[in-house]
Amino acid sequence: MSYTAASQVVARQLAFFEGRKVLIAGELSDAYPVELANVAQSVAVFTTNFGYHNSMSRHDNIDCHFGVQLDAKLDIDMLLIYWPKAKAEADYLMSMLLAKFGPETEICIVGENRSGVRSAEKMFQPYGPLTKYDSARRCSFYWGRCDNEVKPFDLNDWFKSYPINVSGVELTVRSLPGVFSHGEFDNGSKLLINTLPSLRGKVLDFGCGAGVLGAIMKAKHPRIELELCDISALAIESAKETFKVNQLDAKFTATDVYSELKGPYNYLISNPPFHAGLKTFYTATENFIAQAPNYLFSDGQLIIVANSFLKYPELIEQSLETCNALANTNKFTIYSAKK
């Protein structure tokens, strides 16, 4: 089985984990926790990624937890954090986990150098010492210990709020670290909003992020039956907060593409993700498009915005036979297809 570069570096440092009760969190994407369980006394995983949670939950020797924060009471004496791409998300994870497990907790941090992991030493200073022990495969590995008291973790402290005014709709957006649209409303989403037809019936906002698209759609078309979904617990919690602060209602679902969705829908609408961590990632969007006919009513419509260089028209034509470009700029294109 192949492991990520970060996991390969962890495998060089097994002495840190022998006989320990380890909690792993962060930018996890492979099955290395299962391998580590052969060395550690126990291995638990905390993830904000619903797809990863599903894959790890199949293993009897892994105690897997999904959510926006870790609520379960666990007996842990070592944290292993895979450094996220977003520095704010790394800060969030350390603050949340160290507040839970407190002083004298040991921590190992691993990550690709281009992910910003080399800032870990400075970011860990409020908690205690952190020392680099390995550097290989363009990754760095650190060990440290929380020696200082940690202030209680309050999720509300981590939301960023910002106003938007798009297509005549004024809203407040609430987003957590690591969530798409954390602090800004992107031009692709603006183009999509300004291109959408008059919506009716059941509408799915796929890959909802902080809920910006969904909130605008609901504000402009209050009678639609709207569902927002995302693979990220941080995104789902952000979207819920965005809707709450704007007094809007919708259904929110954590899902791995269609895994938890029922359908059918009148509209599948998305600014689909193509970045997962540091790697360009098309698989989720490919599956979203390929399975779209199974989740659309007979007259249902798929509408997505994408970078113009991406090969989505071919995928859409394979799935729904025809693909139309409704609008475009020099960077983005709105694609549409009817069942």
From Swiss-Prot:
<dbReference type="InterPro" id="IPR046977">
    <property type="entry name" value="RsmC/RlmG"/>
</dbReference>
<dbReference type="GO" id="GO:0003676">
    <property type="term" value="F:nucleic acid binding"/>
</dbReference>
<keyword id="KW-0698">rRNA processing</keyword>
<comment type="similarity">
    <text>Belongs to the methyltransferase superfamily. RsmC family.</text>
</comment>
<dbReference type="InterPro" id="IPR029063">
    <property type="entry name" value="SAM-dependent_MTases_sf"/>
</dbReference>
<dbReference type="InterPro" id="IPR013675">
    <property type="entry name" value="Mtase_sm_N"/>
</dbReference>
<dbReference type="InterPro" id="IPR023543">
    <property type="entry name" value="rRNA_ssu_MeTfrase_C"/>
</dbReference>
<keyword id="KW-0808">Transferase</keyword>
<dbReference type="InterPro" id="IPR002052">
    <property type="entry name" value="DNA_methylase_N6_adenine_CS"/>
</dbReference>
<keyword id="KW-0963">Cytoplasm</keyword>
<keyword id="KW-0489">Methyltransferase</keyword>
<comment type="function">
    <text>Specifically methylates the guanine in position 1207 of 16S rRNA in the 30S particle.</text>
</comment>
<keyword id="KW-0949">S-adenosyl-L-methionine</keyword>
<dbReference type="Pfam" id="PF08468">
    <property type="entry name" value="MTS_N"/>
</dbReference>
<comment type="subunit">
    <text>Monomer.</text>
</comment>
<dbReference type="Pfam" id="PF05175">
    <property type="entry name" value="MTS"/>
</dbReference>
<protein>
    <recommendedName>
        <fullName>Ribosomal RNA small subunit methyltransferase C</fullName>
        <ecNumber>2.1.1.172</ecNumber>
    </recommendedName>
</protein>
<dbReference type="GO" id="GO:0005737">
    <property type="term" value="C:cytoplasm"/>
</dbReference>
<dbReference type="InterPro" id="IPR007848">
    <property type="entry name" value="Small_mtfrase_dom"/>
</dbReference>
<dbReference type="GO" id="GO:0052914">
    <property type="term" value="F:16S rRNA (guanine(1207)-N(2))-methyltransferase activity"/>
</dbReference>
